[in-house]
């Protein structure tokens, strides 16, 4: 669900306008969050369908769209809605929704910036639900380099797909900004984190990666030579 904050500066407008050009050149799959009325039309501009689990029972037309997306040969990524809810959707209910929607991929319930709880949830979920349809996406979580590094190592070994978020607090320390802007810290912070994984020799070039959200579209030019970064929402 690509979201851009309103800014007075021209460079932010340029950032937005250049987004489609950047992503077309890189071949990263993109899905924008859209109003329900535009879901059908979104097939024309979204490379895949990104489904928020907490909306499935709130909006019948929302559920209908995603339940029948495969008729149109669409990839569907089912999110556990942790960003929207502040905590992951109940694991048992989430598994039921996976069985109902039959997504191409689904994000296993995680815990915001908590590596231990995320890995515990991942292990419990994968042991409890062994025959769900679709590929498993594990999210990297943590507050420090060591936590994020260790979580990445485990998730990249155990999940089918690795997700890295755009707004870890860690980025506010490692990122750079000429204007003390949080968006710039997040943008450069995730770039640096991925560079660190590559420099340490642990980045899995043989496994697809998903970028959860973004702050500034300029970030993605940094990944032009990293085809393992496959998608963004």
Where do the language-model regions lie?
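Short hydrophobic targeting helices and cationic amphipathic motifs
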Residues: 10-13, 17
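Conserved, mostly hydrophobic/aromatic
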Residues: 79, 138, 223
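Glycine/Thr-rich beta-alpha phosphate-binding loop at enzyme active sites
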Residues: 112, 141-212, 216-218
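Non-catalytic, usually N-terminal nucleic-acid engagement modules in DNA/RNA processing proteins
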Residues: 23-131
């Amino acid at each position: 669900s690509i979201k851009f904050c309103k800014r007075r500066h021209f460079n932010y407008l340029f950032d937005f306008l250049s987004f489609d050009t950047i992503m077309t050149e890189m071949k990263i799959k993109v899905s924008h969050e859209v109003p329900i009325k535009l879901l059908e039309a979104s097939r024309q501009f979204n490379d895949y369908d990104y489904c928020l689990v907490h909306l499935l029972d709130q909006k019948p037309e929302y559920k209908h769209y995603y339940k029948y997306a495969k008729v149109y040969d669409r990839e569907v990524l089912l999110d556990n809605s942790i960003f929207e809810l502040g905590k992951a959707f109940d694991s048992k209910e989430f598994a039921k929704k996976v069985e109902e929607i039959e997504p191409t991929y689904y994000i296993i319930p995680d815990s915001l910036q908590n590596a231990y709880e995320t890995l515990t949830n991942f292990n419990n979920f994968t042991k409890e639900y062994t025959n769900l349809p679709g590929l498993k996406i594990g999210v990297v979580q943590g507050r420090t380099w060591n936590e994020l590094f260790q979580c990445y190592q485990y998730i990249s070994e155990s999940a089918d797909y690795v997700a890295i978020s755009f707004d870890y607090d860690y980025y506010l320390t490692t990122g750079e900004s000429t204007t003390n802007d949080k968006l710039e810290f997040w943008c450069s912070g995730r770039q640096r984190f991925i560079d660190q994984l590559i420099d340490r020799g642990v980045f899995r070039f043989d496994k697809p990666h998903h970028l959860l959200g973004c702050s500034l579209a300029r970030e993605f030019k940094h990944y032009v030579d990293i085809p393992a970064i496959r998608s963004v929402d």
